[in-house]
Amino acid sequence: MAIPALHWLAAPSLQAAFSVPTLTAMVYAMIPALLMNLYITGLNQITDVEIDKINKPNLPIAAGLLSPRDALVTVLSSLVLSLSLGVAHPVLGTQGLNVALWGSAFLGTIYSLQPFRLKRFPFLAAFCIVAVRGAIINAAFFAHAMAAAYGATGASVLGCLASYKSCFLSSLFFGVFGLVIALMKDVPDVIGDRIANILTFSVRIGPKRIFHAMRRLLSVLFFAVGASFLRGAATTSSVGLAACRSLTSVSAILAGLSVRKEAQTVDPDDSQQVYSYYMHLWKLFYLSYLVLPLAR
């Protein structure tokens, strides 16, 4: 969902947003991106089998449904195919696409794999997830859209961050949201992480403090976005922009209220309740991409 949303956010016009070059650039980027996601999540499961037997026993490797050997073949094949597709086409293999793929592969590898295994260190683990969810995915695929679909053949990730406010702000928003999800993910996993000596913030500080801190941070983020776009809607003379900004504002405020309401019935010490809430945040994460093209 992120890739189409960022292509439409970068579009200079409604006609360009639904043109053949745009749709082609989207599809070409989505295939290696899905393969890279398979590599990163698969590698994490391969290296966390013993922990997952405690925290997430239903995952395929932990449950014995997929052998470690077959899993390794799958993730390595996904990595090679993903990176190969990134450079296979002279036009669609943009700098933005390759930054997204290589950056995700690098951070995903050192996050899970020894001797680095950055997930053992709270600050470094959070940095990896924020970097991928924020700058790498958003700015890189925005740059890919500009280069592959909208004629800015020399578009770079840093250039788009510096030149396009929508690119910078979307990267900032999803970077903060990514931080919330990264830290909230560890709250229901405290028992297994403590046994494996993975000192997440939830293990160090306590699941209750992390849960409430992340709930507050995310609700403030949504309310700030809602207020900002409401002000933008009131100050523009364009009917179209006012409508887009109003819809973005209402969506953000409703999402912020949802973050607070759903948290009221959650016991931070109950791993199942926290996991359900964590999955609710993922729904809001992807719904935010659904609204993103309106954020102008």
Where are these regions (language model features)?
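Multi-pass alpha-helical membrane architecture of UbiA-family
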Residues: 1-296
